[in-house]
Amino acid sequence: MACSTLPKSPKDKIDPRDLLIPLILFLSLKGARSAAPGSSPHQVYNITWEVTNGDRETVWAISGNHPLWTWWPVLTPDLCMLALSGPPHWGLEYQAPYSSPPGPPCCSGSSGSSAGCSRDCDEPLTSLTPRCNTAWNRLKLDQVTHKSSEGFYVCPGSHRPREAKSCGGPDSFYCASWGCETTGRVYWKPSSSWDYITVDNNLTTSQAVQVCKDNKWCNPLAIQFTNAGKQVTSWTTGHYWGLRLYVSGRDPGLTFGIRLRYQNLGPRVPIGPNPVLADQLSLPRPNPLPKPAKSPPASNSTPTLISPSPTPTQPPPAGTGDRLLNLVQGAYQALNLTNPDKTQECWLCLVSGPPYYEGVAVLGTYSNHTSAPANCSVASQHKLTLSEVTGRGLCIGTVPKTHQALCNTTLKIDKGSYYLVAPTGTTWACNTGLTPCLSATVLNRTTDYCVLVELWPRVTYHPPSYVYSQFEKSYRHKREPVSLTLALLLGGLTMGGIAAGVGTGTTALVATQQFQQLHAAVQDDLKEVEKSITNLEKSLTSLSEVVLQNRRGLDLLFLKEGGLCAALKEECCFYADHTGLVRDSMAKLRERLTQRQKLFESSQGWFEGLFNRSPWFTTLISTIMGPLIILLLILLFGPCILNRLVQFVKDRISVVQALVLTQQYHQLKPLEYEP
């Protein structure tokens, strides 16, 4: 900052009323916080806070595993690190980031005199311009930053208020005029209620002097995030500041930035063929037999056949059909173990439309971890909502009244930075989605609430009579039966002791293995469904291609066309009995329907069979039956009705004739005779 020898007053500040509008705008956006798009706020990422120089190169960084927007460490880069590849007056314009402290050391230090030293660090310091290229200059810089009459001040960059137009740009280190500074270590102690950071020294004067004498970076800063900075979610793009030394003459300065990096966000979707349909593998085909190769003919010998030795090949990845078959196979084994009467003969059906999974609320004991476990970093983007959870279980957080019916026990968590991990075979169903573990920091900072649930695939159980009746030619419409899902049949299996292997003996061990197979199949299918949803959300292809991304519907269509399942309404059904799951379910369905048809025909009489064997005869009879009945009624009751009608007409005619004759004659009065 260009400055005369006049004292610099801290009174020339920006009027606080000028900051009122930006402050209101900031408070209005304060609640607009979100985690990574499409992810759970409790998901743990590998977070890295980076401090950059004026060329946007990283010169210092710190990493940790935490949920987004919950970890705000103190950043401690050295002041000279910010000057690497920076302005020439710092003496480090040719030094790359992460370089060691350059220049000759002092001639005295903790290790004694050093060869090639430049000056004695113990001699009195002069008022030379502080630089970073030697140990002597870094010691002088330490004197400036710790002296009460000198120091440094920091001015915000692009995120400053619009009214601060006089603060300039990077050329003036965002400090072109007084009043632009918001933090620093100078005697007037600048401050701000809206800036994102505060900057101070991280070492005392005596500590810094000793480190400088040892030819190390000896001017570390302490950058702390303010409450306003902790509410901002734009750190991934970076924010920038300018720093200037408060010395006599022209104040030297530099610019630096702070940005956030986080990993484990999933694969990026390239522009091109849609990856959702890329792994639609067909059913495995048998490998062709190797062709015999003839050996070179030898003299006086017959040719011999030599079979080439098979070369080991890696098994192909599991296709969509195999994945869904594994899911149904695991469901069958778990059902056969717990309810063997249900698997005498049954059909297990996969639904083609969402939801593909349902949850059962359970009670369980979660584990408490001070550091994030490995499974907390697993991406959890499953679209299960609390409206699809049944039962009563363990709840955490502030549960609204509309969902308190799911809670048998509600726990309030204490403040702190720790993680709650769900027991094996369960997960947390929160109002933000599914997650294997919860962050106490996120729960205390938000209004999130969660329920401990078991996840069960939406596999529908049907008795054989219902399935066969849907494929038979029946003219009677029966009432739709109540569908039983796997969650209703096996709900509470995990916390009931089977998954944990409760008990001793073979039964408990087998039960654990059966459930683990189902659990593994569920996890594989959830990953594929999640991948399809992610690709669908990020797809840049045409609408017709997006419509084809109904992954589960396509998977079931492939199974149906391959004869592996029977299509029943919107479900793909597999036949199962005590021998196991039948892969060729369509052949089994045809066989059972043929058997039922023969049994039905054998129990019918010749008259009923006539109607079943001649469909045209049924149509003919139903067409002429009405006219024939009417004609028969006419023949039976027609003569009687006709006679009655004729007699009635005759009677009326006779009455009319009598009336006519009566009108032509007059009645004579009787004569009276006198005595």
From Swiss-Prot:
<feature type="disulfide bond">
    <location>
        <begin position="395"/>
        <end position="407"/>
    </location>
</feature>
<keyword id="KW-1032">Host cell membrane</keyword>
<feature type="disulfide bond">
    <location>
        <begin position="212"/>
        <end position="218"/>
    </location>
</feature>
<feature type="region of interest" description="Immunosuppression">
    <location>
        <begin position="548"/>
        <end position="564"/>
    </location>
</feature>
<keyword id="KW-0479">Metal-binding</keyword>
<feature type="region of interest" description="Disordered">
    <location>
        <begin position="276"/>
        <end position="323"/>
    </location>
</feature>
<feature type="compositionally biased region" description="Pro residues">
    <location>
        <begin position="309"/>
        <end position="318"/>
    </location>
</feature>
<comment type="function">
    <text>The surface protein (SU) attaches the virus to the host cell by binding to its receptor. This interaction triggers the refolding of the transmembrane protein (TM) and is thought to activate its fusogenic potential by unmasking its fusion peptide. Fusion occurs at the host cell plasma membrane.</text>
</comment>
<keyword id="KW-1162">Viral penetration into host cytoplasm</keyword>
<feature type="disulfide bond">
    <location>
        <begin position="376"/>
        <end position="430"/>
    </location>
</feature>
<keyword id="KW-0165">Cleavage on pair of basic residues</keyword>
<feature type="compositionally biased region" description="Low complexity">
    <location>
        <begin position="296"/>
        <end position="308"/>
    </location>
</feature>
<feature type="short sequence motif" description="YXXL motif; contains endocytosis signal">
    <location>
        <begin position="665"/>
        <end position="668"/>
    </location>
</feature>
<keyword id="KW-1168">Fusion of virus membrane with host membrane</keyword>
<feature type="disulfide bond">
    <location>
        <begin position="80"/>
        <end position="132"/>
    </location>
</feature>
<feature type="short sequence motif" description="CXXC">
    <location>
        <begin position="346"/>
        <end position="349"/>
    </location>
</feature>
<keyword id="KW-0812">Transmembrane</keyword>
<feature type="binding site">
    <location>
        <position position="89"/>
    </location>
    <ligand>
        <name>Zn(2+)</name>
    </ligand>
</feature>
<dbReference type="Pfam" id="PF00429">
    <property type="entry name" value="TLV_coat"/>
</dbReference>
<keyword id="KW-1043">Host membrane</keyword>
<keyword id="KW-0175">Coiled coil</keyword>
<keyword id="KW-0325">Glycoprotein</keyword>
<feature type="glycosylation site" description="N-linked (GlcNAc...) asparagine; by host">
    <location>
        <position position="336"/>
    </location>
</feature>
<feature type="disulfide bond">
    <location>
        <begin position="565"/>
        <end position="572"/>
    </location>
</feature>
<feature type="disulfide bond" description="Interchain (between SU and TM chains, or C-349 with C-573); in linked form">
    <location>
        <begin position="346"/>
        <end position="573"/>
    </location>
</feature>
<keyword id="KW-1169">Fusion of virus membrane with host cell membrane</keyword>
<feature type="glycosylation site" description="N-linked (GlcNAc...) asparagine; by host">
    <location>
        <position position="202"/>
    </location>
</feature>
<keyword id="KW-0449">Lipoprotein</keyword>
<keyword id="KW-1133">Transmembrane helix</keyword>
<feature type="glycosylation site" description="N-linked (GlcNAc...) asparagine; by host">
    <location>
        <position position="368"/>
    </location>
</feature>
<feature type="region of interest" description="Receptor-binding domain (RBD)">
    <location>
        <begin position="35"/>
        <end position="270"/>
    </location>
</feature>
<keyword id="KW-0862">Zinc</keyword>
<feature type="signal peptide">
    <location>
        <begin position="1"/>
        <end position="34"/>
    </location>
</feature>
<dbReference type="GO" id="GO:0019064">
    <property type="term" value="P:fusion of virus membrane with host plasma membrane"/>
</dbReference>
<keyword id="KW-0472">Membrane</keyword>
<feature type="disulfide bond">
    <location>
        <begin position="106"/>
        <end position="121"/>
    </location>
</feature>
<dbReference type="GO" id="GO:0020002">
    <property type="term" value="C:host cell plasma membrane"/>
</dbReference>
<feature type="disulfide bond">
    <location>
        <begin position="107"/>
        <end position="117"/>
    </location>
</feature>
<feature type="region of interest" description="Fusion peptide">
    <location>
        <begin position="482"/>
        <end position="502"/>
    </location>
</feature>
<feature type="glycosylation site" description="N-linked (GlcNAc...) asparagine; by host">
    <location>
        <position position="375"/>
    </location>
</feature>
<keyword id="KW-0564">Palmitate</keyword>
<keyword id="KW-1161">Viral attachment to host cell</keyword>
